[in-house]
C-alpha cells in the first residue's frame, strides 16, 4: 500500500479475448532507477487469492496478452521477454504469435524459466477460445496436451531459451519420474534447455545483521551461534542441553520426503539423543503426524504447525542440522539459507540439493553437508546418524565453516543469466 500511493497512472488500452474488450489500466513506478509497470483490471485482479480461482485460465491469459500489448502501448523497444512458470507462460506464446503479423515484435527474443514442472497450467480444450488464438495452436507441436491445453508446454515450445532453477533439475526432467508428463517435450527441445541455480538474498539472510536473531554472529565468531541454540530451546520448551537439533522449515507435502520421515522418525527419536523442531503447514496427514510425534516425544520434538517468518530466522540460526529428504526439489532455498547460518543440511541428492550440497569427506575435509542418493528411509536414517557422529568431534566446526563459506548469493546466477541473454540477442 505504501508503494501503491506512488504509482503514476499512464493511461489505458483494451485487450480482445473471446469477442470481448477488456480494460487494462497502466501504472508506472520508478524504484532505484528501474521502471516498473503495473496492469489494472478490477474484474480479474481484485481477488483474495493470486491464483486458485475458477477462472484462472481466463485471468492469466488476459494478463499474458496484456503484457505483450503493453510493449507497443508504451513504445518500448524490447530485446528479451523473460517469463516464469505457467502463470506467465502464455506471454511467450503471444509474443511469437504477434511477431507473425507485426514488425514491432519480430526481433523480440523470449526466455522461459521453469521453477516447478509439477504445476503446468492445464485447462480443457474448450479454453482455447478464451485465448483468441488460432485453432492451429491446438496441435501436438503447440498447446495441445492430450485432450487439453497446457500453458507451460506452449512456453517450452515457443520460447527461444528455457531454463530451470538448477542444473541437475534440467537433466532430471528429461525422465518420466520427474517429467510430470512433459518429459517427451523436454527431450524434444533439450537443445534450448539449461539450468541456472537460484540464489538467496544475502541482505535478508545474514546472521551478522539479522534483526530476528537472539544474538548476531558470523564466520569469525561462530561460537555465538550456540547462544541462539540455547534461546531456541527455551523458546520452544526444550531442555537446554548439548544435543544436536534437527529442524525442518518446509511445506508439509509428500514431495518433501515426509513419507521417509514418517517411516524412521519413531526409531530416530527412540534411539538417538536429539531434539527436532518443525515449522510449516501442509497436508493434514503430515500435520497430524508431527503432532503425534510431539505427543509421544514431548521432550524431543516440537511441532509448530504454522509458518512464521521471524521464527524461521531463529530456527535457521539455532538449529544444528536441517533435514531435506526431498523426493524432488527443483532448486531448494532452505538448504541455502541454512548453510548461510552454519546449519548443516542433510539432504537427498535430487535437483538443486545435489547441485548445492556436497557430502562431507572426513579425509579431505571438503563438503558442506550430508547427503544420500536413494529414496530409501533407512538410507536417510543412516545419514542422520552419520551427521550426529560428526556433531561430537572437531570436524563439526569445519563443516559449519564450509557451509558458511558456500557462495549462494545471486551474483553467479545473475552472470549466467546475462550470458544467456547475450547469446540469444547476438
What role is predicted for each listed range?
Residues 1-426:
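Catalytic cores of nucleotide-sugar-dependent glycosyltransferases that transfer UDP/GDP/TDP-activated
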Amino acid at each position: 500500500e505504501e508503494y501503491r500511493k506512488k504509482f503514476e497512472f499512464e493511461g489505458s488500452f483494451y485487450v480482445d479475448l473471446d469477442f470481448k474488450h477488456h480494460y487494462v489500466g497502466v501504472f508506472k513506478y520508478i524504484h532505484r532507477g528501474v521502471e516498473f509497470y503495473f496492469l489494472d483490471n478490477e474484474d480479474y485482479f481484485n481477488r483474495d487469492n493470486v491464483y486458485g480461482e475458477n477462472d484462472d485460465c481466463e485471468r492469466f491469459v488476459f494478463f499474458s496478452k496484456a503484457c505483450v500489448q503493453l510493449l507497443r502501448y508504451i513504445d518500448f523497444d524490447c530485446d528479451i521477454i523473460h517469463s516464469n512458470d505457467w502463470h506467465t507462460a502464455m506471454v511467450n506464446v503471444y509474443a511469437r504469435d504477434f511477431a507473425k503479423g507485426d514488425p514491432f515484435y519480430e526481433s523480440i527474443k523470449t526466455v522461459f524459466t521453469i521453477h516447478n514442472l509439477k504445476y503446468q497450467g492445464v485447462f480443457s480444450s474448450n479454453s482455447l477460445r478464451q485465448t483468441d488464438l488460432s485453432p492451429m495452436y491446438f496441435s501436438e507441436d503447440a498447446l495441445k496436451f492430450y485432450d487439453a491445453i497446457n500453458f507451460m508446454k506452449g512456453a517450452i515450445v515457443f520460447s527461444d531459451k528455457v531454463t530451470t532453477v538448477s542444473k541437475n533439475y534440467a537433466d532430471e526432467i528429461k525422465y518420466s519420474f520427474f517429467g510430470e508428463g512433459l518429459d517427451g517435450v523436454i527431450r524434444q527441445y533439450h537443445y534450448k534447455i539449461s539450468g541456472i541455480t537460484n540464489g538467496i538474498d544475502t541482505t535478508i539472510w545474514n546472521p551478522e545483521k539479522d534483526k530476528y536473531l537472539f544474538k548476531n554472529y558470523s564466520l569469525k565468531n561462530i561460537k555465538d551461534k550456540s547462544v541462539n541454540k540455547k534461546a531456541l530451546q527455551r523458546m520452544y520448551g526444550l531442555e537446554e542441553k548439548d544435543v544436536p537439533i534437527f529442524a525442518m522449515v518446509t511445506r508439509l507435502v509428500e514431495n518433501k520426503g515426509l513419507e521417509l520421515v514418517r517411516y524412521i522418525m519413531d526409531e530416530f527419536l527412540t534411539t538417538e539423543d536429539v531434539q527436532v523442531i518443525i515449522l510449516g503447514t501442509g497436508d493434514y496427514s503430515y500435520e497430524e503426524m508431527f503432532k503425534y510425534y510431539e505427543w509421544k516425544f514431548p521432550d524431543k520434538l516440537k511441532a509448530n504447525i504454522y509458518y512464521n517468518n521471524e521464527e524461521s530466522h531463529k530456527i535457521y540460526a539455532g538449529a544444528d542440522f536441517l533435514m531435506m529428504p526431498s523426493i524432488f526439489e527443483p532448486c531448494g532455498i532452505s538448504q541455502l539459507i541454512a548453510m548461510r547460518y552454519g546449519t548443516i543440511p542433510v539432504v537427498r541428492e535430487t535437483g538443486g540439493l545435489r547441485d548445492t550440497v556436497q557430502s562431507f569427506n572426513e579425509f579431505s575435509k571438503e563438503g558442506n553437508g550430508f547427503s544420500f542418493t536413494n529414496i530409501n528411509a533407512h538410507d536417510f536414517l543412516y545419514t542422520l546418524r552419520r551427521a550426529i557422529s560428526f556433531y561430537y568431534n572437531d570436524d563439526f566446526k569445519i563443516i559449519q565453516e564450509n557451509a558458511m563459506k558456500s557462495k549462494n548469493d545471486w551474483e553467479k546466477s545473475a552472470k549466467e543469466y546475462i550470458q544467456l541473454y547475450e547469446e540469444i540477442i547476438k
